[in-house]
Structures are given as C-alpha cells and as structure tokens.
A protein has these predicted regions:
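A hydrolase-biased, glycine/serine/histidine/acidic-enriched motif that marks catalytic-domain neighborhoods
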Residues: 1-270
C-alpha cells in the first residue's frame, strides 16, 4: 500500500485559476490501480485507498457512513476549504455520494461541487426486477496473475463492500439545485445536491450461464442505473462508455473512459 492517503495521482502546476481538484475514491477492491491508468485529466487528481484492506471480515467498517466520515479527514489534510470534485468507480461512486452529503451538512468550508459516478450501480433500487440473488464467487471479476493471498484479500474486500452497500441508508437531498451546490441552507433542511454525472458501461458482464446476470447489471435496464429511484434529477447527465462494468479501465477502453471523465469534469451544468 502507498505510504500516503490520499495519493497524488496526477499533478498540475499551481495557478490562480486552477480547477477544483478531483478526489477519486477506491472501488470495492479498496485499491487505486485502475485510476493510475488514466490519461491526463487537466487538474490535480488524488486517490483514496482503503486503509483497512488487510483487515478480515467487516474490517472495522460498520457502515458506509463510517467509511465516509473516516475519509473526510484525509481529504481535509489536502484541502481544508474551498471546492472539490468527488468521483469513483462502482463502490467509489456510492462513497462519493455519502461523503458529499456529510460535507454539505457539516458546513465547515469544504464543499463538493460535482460528483462523477463511474458505472456505480445504485445499491438500494427497490424495483422487483432489480433484486439480486446472493453473490457467488463466479460473479467476481477474473484476477489473472494475482497470487492466492492477494486474491483472498480482494474477495474479502468485495464481499465487505457488497454487504455495506446492501445496508446503506441513502442520504436525503433537496429536490432542487438552488443556491450554492453541495451546501445546506438551514440546519435540519436537506442540502442542495452537487452536480452529478453518471458514466455507464454499454455492455453486460458476460456470464458462463446465459440465464444468469451479474449483480452489477441488475439495474442496467434503467438509464441511470437506479439512481433515479434514490432521487429524481439527482443525476443530471448520463454518458455511455465502451466495455462492461469490469472492463471499462482495460487497455482497450482506457482512452475512452479518460475522455468521458474529462467531459464529465468540464460539462457546463449550471
């Protein structure tokens, strides 16, 4: 694991008009490997990895709120006040939503102006056709070249993320984007949501049994992967990218996903 958390993934010379830094939150693996493959994003990019990757079982994390609260501290070591962008692949997008809400309600000078969900499935979709079967080992991604010890840790991390996502109590946002995004106007009133962009994979994860569906594709029939059921209008823009959930960061697709993340950062949504 890196010594620092967050890790500086891409640097940018300091300037008066530099764009808000992007903090990418780890996926369900707890690692940042995929984000280091990205091409230049035109701003300072940090990555947060799971400091409890080596822990067994639930690993000390009791909830997504628990993780989000812990991750706010290292973010504030880098950026105490001002505006940031949060994003993440899969589980990292879910964590980004929770972190953004906690920062919005704390009112302590740091706010999230935009969230980028990279094929993040809304885990609490209530629709009957979106209900998933219990996770099975063959639903996990192939891990070629990974030794057994690391493979076991990755599988533990994946199951931990699945368990916590299934128990997540999604935060409440106001229904309109008025005033300063990512802030709460009054104590006890739901905060104004940041801008949110969803990058969704075009393809389904291939399964050996054609009758089976990967759990991460259970909301693929919905334009916003289920986020429309958390709150209508929360996701403002959807961008389709090549590949399936597990392959969007593969070499064949890395230039495309880089371009889509840059577009998500630069879109004028005001």
């Amino acid at each position: 694991m890196p010594a620092a958390n967050p890790v500086l993934i891409q640097d940018l010379p300091r300037s008066r008009n530099e764009p808000p830094p992007l903090f990418l939150i780890h996926d369900a693996s707890g690692l940042l490997t995929s984000y280091f493959k990205l091409g230049t994003l035109g701003r300072r990019v940090y990555g947060l990895w799971d400091p409890k990757f080596d822990a067994d079982g639930i690993g000390g994390w009791q909830s997504i709120r628990d993780i989000a609260e812990a991750y706010i501290r290292p973010i504030k070591r880098v950026m105490l006040r001002g505006e940031i962008v949060l994003g993440g692949w899969s589980f990292g997008g879910v964590l980004s939503v929770q972190i953004a809400h906690m920062l919005a309600t704390s009112g302590r000078g740091l706010r999230v102006s935009r969230i980028i969900l990279i094929d993040s499935v809304y885990p609490r979709c209530p629709r009957p056709e979106a209900q998933k079967e219990p996770a099975k080992l063959h639903h996990a991604p192939a891990l070629p070249g990974v030794n057994q010890e690391t493979r076991d840790k990755l599988m533990t991390a994946l199951m931990r993320a699945t368990c916590l996502s299934d128990q997540w109590d999604p935060p409440a946002w106001s229904s309109s984007r008025t005033g300063v995004l990512g802030t709460a106007r009054l104590h006890g009133v739901p905060p104004t949501p940041p801008h949110a962009v969803l990058i969704r994979a075009r393809d389904m994860v291939p399964m050996a049994d054609p009758e089976e569906k990967c759990p991460l594709d259970r909301t693929r029939f919905l334009p916003q992967l289920g986020w429309e059921d958390m709150q209508e209008g929360f996701v403002e823009q959807v961008i389709e990218t090549t590949g399936n959930h597990y392959s969007v960061f593969d070499q064949d697709h890395i230039d495309t996903i880089t371009a889509h993340i840059r577009k998500s950062l630069d879109l004028n949504l005001d």
